Every structure is written in structure tokens, then in C-alpha cells.
A protein has these predicted regions:
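A short, N-terminal "cap"/entry segment at the start of jelly-roll beta-barrel domains
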Residues: 1-47, 147-181
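Conserved short histidine dyad/triad with adjacent acidic residue
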Residues: 33-37, 48-64
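Short acidic-glycine-tyrosine-enriched beta hairpin
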Residues: 42-43, 70-72, 84-103
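Glycine- and acidic-residue-biased ligand/ion/polar-headgroup-sensing regions
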Residues: 56, 66-79, 83-84
């Protein structure tokens, strides 16, 4: 019940809440990975909360989608690529920084530091479903990724991205912004 006082109070609703909830599902995106803190199938919500990890030396290639995303960096250092009036530019990010990516804005990420780049990602359930469909579930007994795994992932990624209406930069477009695929 909400107290009837002048002090600050927050109504969390009548449904039970959890502190630090997670679905336990983590998927590998052939380098970067995401952990689902909320399920994209959850009803009654218009967002999906993820914890994203980009290992040292790894990039997320140039892409865009109609879904908005907000990133809150929780540890590590990295860079985000944005398209400005003068073309593409990399911006430096560190723990505590927030990045808003509007729908259909071309963007990319890279970790140029020696530790994982970790962020909370607030996005749409649709993008969460995309990650579920394209990612490889992470299990504690997973074997290292092989070149065949990467080739299979790239083919599946392109197919699923097309189904969702997402755009991915070509190898040439990525090379032009400093990402070598």
C-alpha cells in the first residue's frame, strides 16, 4: 500500500517483484553475448532488459534496426560508432555512460580495452526475440567456436536479420569505419 504522506514513495504495483531478476538465458553472438534479465515473451511490458558483454578486441559490426536501444555502461571501456553530420565518428565510453540509439540509426560497438565491456541494454521485446533466435545458448560445457560455427552463425544471422527487417553493413562498409570482418 502507498503511504499517504509527503515523503517520496514508489508504487511497484501489486505483482511480486524480484531484486536482480534474470531469466538465466545467455546467448553467444560469436564473440559478444547477451544475458536476458527479462524475457522478450513477458506480457504486460514494452521493453526487454539485457546485460551485454563485448570481450576485449571484439566488435559488433555496423547495423541498424527500427528498435530503439539504451545502453548503460556498467564496466570496462569501449567505443560506439554514431553517424553525425560530418559522417561516422567513434565516441569513447566508460562505466556510468549512457548511450541512446534511436530507431534506424546506423551504429556499431567495439572493445579496444583489455577487459570486457559490459552494459545494460534496454530495448524492445522484438530485438530480444531476434537475439534469442540468432544466438547460440551458452552452456557451461560449451566448446570453443570453430570457423564452421562462425560461417553458420553469419548465414543464420543474415537470414534472421532479413526476416526481422534489420540492416547489416557490408564488409566494405564496416572496413570504411575501421571494423574488419
Amino acid at each position: 500500500m502507498r503511504p499517504e504522506t509527503d515523503s517520496e514513495s514508489y508504487c511497484l504495483g501489486e505483482r511480486a517483484t524480484e531484486i536482480n531478476p534474470t531469466t538465466g538465458m545467455r546467448v553467444d553472438l560469436t564473440g559478444p553475448s547477451v544475458e536476458f534479465l527479462t524475457s522478450p515473451q513477458e506480457t504486460g511490458t514494452d521493453f526487454c532488459l539485457l546485460r551485454g558483454v563485448i570481450p576485449p578486441g571484439v566488435s559488433v559490426p555496423l547495423h541498424s534496426h527500427p528498435d530503439t536501444e539504451d545502453f548503460i555502461v556498467i564496466s570496462g571501456e569501449g567505443q560506439a560508432l554514431r553517424q553525425g553530420t560530418g559522417g561516422y565518428e567513434w565516441i569513447e565510453l566508460k562505466a556510468g555512460d549512457h548511450v541512446h540509439v534511436p530507431g534506424n540509426a546506423p551504429h556499431a560497438w567495439r572493445n579496444t580495452a583489455g577487459a570486457p565491456f559490459v552494459s545494460f541494454i534496454i530495448t524492445t521485446p522484438k530485438l530480444g526475440k531476434f537475439f534469442q533466435e540468432v544466438g547460440r545458448p551458452i552452456k557451461s560445457t560449451d566448446q570453443p567456436v570453430t570457423p564452421e560455427d562462425i560461417a553458420d552463425f553469419v548465414a543464420r544471422f543474415q537470414s534472421v536479420a532479413g526476416k526481422f527487417g534489420y540492416w547489416n553493413g557490408t564488409p566494405e562498409e564496416n572496413a570504411a569505419v575501421g571494423i574488419n570482418l
